[in-house]
């Protein structure tokens, strides 16, 4: 029995360890003069994606590249970064970062919420998200939420489990359309694909996924009444991380990173002109 319990705890330890990541703490980097942070991610159009060569790129990636350069230039150390995980699942990435140790940062469309602040540390916000209510192009435009039971009659709402957009869909169901049919997906990408493939599907999707659908010319319709621009995205770190003060300093330096030409160039590069126009709407 004793041997069985020992084996059980060893297996539990190794299984748990395999589900998390490790990176060097700022304290270690400062002491040693060198180190590496681990960058976990969830693939998100424009924010974190792979280019034609298979290289990870995007808004989040470019910002973290600037952060690493800033640390090296201002602190006199040699900091590097490595990507961990496969980027396939929001919930998986979030949970692994939450349970990780040291210099681990999660990248993607992670909304800053009070609930999540109890589980992970956040960087300052790096963008204001623009969540968009979408359907097939043949669905009449929704004039007001009270019309959901009639305008969206017979439609199914798709949403990825554990996301802020899932909460939005459930709020619509509770407040305006109790008989609404819902279907869970694993990722936001899957949600988009479901709506594209189902003429009677609808969803809330972040700006990046809406732009992807528009580029694909899939006949997706935006319902402006549903636009939501109150939330902000941030990078996440485990609660044991000592990198958050340095991250805050980076965003505040030189008049504010979000006010810099480097940041604006990153947005234009990955969102394009259509995305920039919608971002201006989000800021109003």
Predicted segments with their positions:
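Ligand-binding cleft/hinge of the Venus flytrap
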Residues: 65-81, 162-186, 214-215
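Periplasmic-binding protein-like
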Residues: 41-43, 127-135, 140-141, 207-252, ...
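Hydrophobic residues within well-ordered alpha-helices
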Residues: 67, 94-98, 191-197, 235
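Acidic, polar ligand-binding/catalytic clefts
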Residues: 65, 76-150, 220-228
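Beta->alpha turn/N-cap motifs
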Residues: 40-45, 85-90, 100-114, 136, ...
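Extracytoplasmic small-molecule ligand-binding "clamshell" domains
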Residues: 20-109, 118
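Extended ligand-binding regions for polar small-molecule ligands
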Residues: 20-23, 27, 61-70, 138-164, ...
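Sec-dependent N-terminal signal peptides
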Residues: 4-16
């Amino acid at each position: 029995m004793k041997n069985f319990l020992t084996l059980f705890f060893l297996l539990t330890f190794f299984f748990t360890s395999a589900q998390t990541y490790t990176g060097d703490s700022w304290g270690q980097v400062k002491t040693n003069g060198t180190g590496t942070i681990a960058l976990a991610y969830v693939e998100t159009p424009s924010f974190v994606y792979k280019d034609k060569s298979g290289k990870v790129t995007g808004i989040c990636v470019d910002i973290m590249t600037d952060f690493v350069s800033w640390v090296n230039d201002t602190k006199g150390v040699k900091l590097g970064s490595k990507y961990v995980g496969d980027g396939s699942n929001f919930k998986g990435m979030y949970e692994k970062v939450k349970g990780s140790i040291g210099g681990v940062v999660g990248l993607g469309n992670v909304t800053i919420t009070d609930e999540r602040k109890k589980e992970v540390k956040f960087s300052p916000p790096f963008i204001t998200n623009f969540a968009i209510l979408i359907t097939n192009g043949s669905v009449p435009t929704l004039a007001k939420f009270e019309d959901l039971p009639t305008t969206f009659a017979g439609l199914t709402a798709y949403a990825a489990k554990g996301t802020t957009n899932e909460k939005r869909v459930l709020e619509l169901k509770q407040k305006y359309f109790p008989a609404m049919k819902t279907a869970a997906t694993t990722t936001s990408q899957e949600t988009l694909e479901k709506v594209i493939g189902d003429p009677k599907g609808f969803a809330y999707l972040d700006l990046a996924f809406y732009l992807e659908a528009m580029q694909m010319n899939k006949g997706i319709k935006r319902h402006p009444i549903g636009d939501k621009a109150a939330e902000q995205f941030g990078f996440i770190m485990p609660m044991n991380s000592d990198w958050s003060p340095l991250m805050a300093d980076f965003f505040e330096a030189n008049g504010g990173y979000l006010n810099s030409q480097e940041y604006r160039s990153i947005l234009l590069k990955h969102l394009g002109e259509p995305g920039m126009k919608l971002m201006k709407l989000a800021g109003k």
